[in-house]
Amino acid sequence: MEKFQGYLEFDGARQQSFLYPLFFRDYIYVLAYDHGLNRLNRNRPIFLENADYDKKYSSLIVKRLILRMYEQNRLIIPTKDLNKNLGHTNNFYYQMISVLFAVIVEIPFSLRLGSSIEGKNVKKSYNLQSLHSIFPFLEDKLSHFNYVLDVLIPYPIHLEILVQTLRYRVKDASSLHFFRFCLYEYCNWKNFDSKKKSILNPRFLLFLYNSHVCEYESIFFFLRKQSSHLRSTSYDVFFERILFYGKIQHFFKVFVNNFSALLGLLKDPFLHYVRYHGKYILATKDTPLLMNKWKYYFVNLWQCYFSVWFQSQKVNINQLSKDNLEFLGYLSSLRLNPLVVRSQMLENSFLIDNVRIKLDSNIPISSIIGSLAKDKFCNVLGHPISKATWTDSSDSDILNRFVRICRNISHYYSGSSNKKNLYRIKYILRLCCVKTLARKHKSTVRAFLKRLGSGLLEEFLTGEDQVLSLIFPRSDYASKRLYRVRVWYLDILYLNDLVNHE
C-alpha cells in the first residue's frame, strides 16, 4: 500500500485534501482500474474488483472523462452530451466519481492501519483470513460459555448520519461537502427511478458501511479495554478520531451512568466478540440478568449515540445448551457428550461418568434445500429435478457445473458434525445432473446411467474423497471414521452461494 501513496502526492498543506488527487491527478483514475492492483490484493476480494468494469472501462474513456470534467463549469455533465460522446448510460459518471473517491480515501486509512499493526508487532497470518479459522476458536471457547448475544448490525436510514460519522475521521471540509453531494445525488436518482441500477459503486457503499461499523467497534473496544485487566494488542488497530473523548463523555451523560458503573457491566474476562456478514455475536458466561443488561446497552448505544433506530427484537439471547446459533451457514449448539472412564485403585475398580461439552456445527438442511429449490435444482420437498435452462450447453459443460457446485459445497461444509445432510445435498446434485443430461438426450434416467456406467458419479468425488478411497477401502472401519472427521480449511475467503440465499 505504501507504493500507492506516491500517486496521491500529499504534502503538508494537502495531507487531508482528498479532492486534490481526484481533480488534479489523472493517473489515479487509471490506478483505480489497474489489474495489477487487484493481483497485489488477492486476499482482499472486494478491493478494486468488479467484473463489469473490465468490459466497459478503458484508459481512453477515462482520459476523455477527465478532459470533459476540466472543461465543464459545473460538476454534472448533461445526460444528452454524455450519451452522445461516450455511448454509456447517464450513471456512468457518478460510478466513476464514487469509486475514485473511495480509492483515494481508503489509501490513507489503510496506511494508518498498517502502521498501527506494525508498531504493535502483530504477526500477519493469512490462515486467519479463512472463514473456517473462526470455528476452531469457537469450539475451544464456546464450550465454557452459557449465553450468546446474536445481534444484527443496524444501518442508518438517513445518509446524513454517515456523513456525521465520517466527519470525525476526515478533516477536509471540501471533501465532506463533495461526499454529501454524491450521497444526495444518489438518493435523488434512486427516488426518480427505482428500476435504475445504483449510480454509486458497491465499493463506495462498502467503505461507508465499514466506517460506520468501525466507529461503533472503536467505542465498544475502548470501554472493553479500559475495563479489562487482560491487555491485548488487537484493540490498538482502530483509528484515533477527533473529539473522541468528548464524545465518550457525552455518551455517558446520555446513559445517566457514571464511568465506574458502566465499566462494572463490561468487566468480564470471559467475553468474546465476533463480527460476520452484517451481524455480530457476543459470547459470555453470565446470568440472564446480565445478558439483558448487555441487550439494553447495545440498544441504547445505537439509538442514543448513533441516532439509529434499533429495536430490541434484533438482539437475540441464545442459551447454547438449548438454542441453535446460526453462524456462517452452520447451525451451532452445545451437546453433552457422556464419557465413561474405568478407574482402578488396588483391587477395587469403579466407573466414573464424565460429561464433556462439545460444540456441534451442523448443516441447515432446510435452508439449503430452499436455496436449491429456488435455483431449480429440486422442488421444495428436496426431490431432484432437471435443470432445463442448462440443456443447451454441452455435456462436459453441464457436468463441470454440477461437479464444481458439489465440490464447493463439500469443501465449505467439511466441518459439519453430521455428514448425513451433506450426503443428501450431494445426492440431490448428482441426480439433478443425471436428469438434466437425460433430458438433453431425450432418454430416461435408468437408460442413461446404464449406457454411461458409474464413471459419471465418480466425477463428483472431492479431492479428499479420492485420497481416502485410494488409501482405505470403503468397508474398512478406519475409513468410516475418517469420513466422519470434521475438517476446517484455511483457504475459504467467501461464504458459499447457498448460504443466506435470498
Curated annotation (Swiss-Prot):
InterPro entries: Domain_X (IPR024937), Maturase_MatK (IPR002866), Maturase_MatK_N (IPR024942). It comes from the Eukaryota. Pfam families: Intron_maturas2, MatK_N. The keyword Plastid applies. GO terms for cellular component: chloroplast. One of its GO terms (biological process) is mRNA processing. GO terms for molecular function: RNA binding. Keywords: Chloroplast, mRNA processing, Plastid, RNA-binding, tRNA processing. It is found in: Plastid, Chloroplast. Usually encoded in the trnK tRNA gene intron. Probably assists in splicing its own and other chloroplast group II introns. Belongs to the intron maturase 2 family. MatK subfamily. This is Maturase K. It comes from Brassica campestris (Field mustard). The lineage of its organism: Eukaryota, Viridiplantae, Streptophyta, Embryophyta, Tracheophyta. The gene is matK.
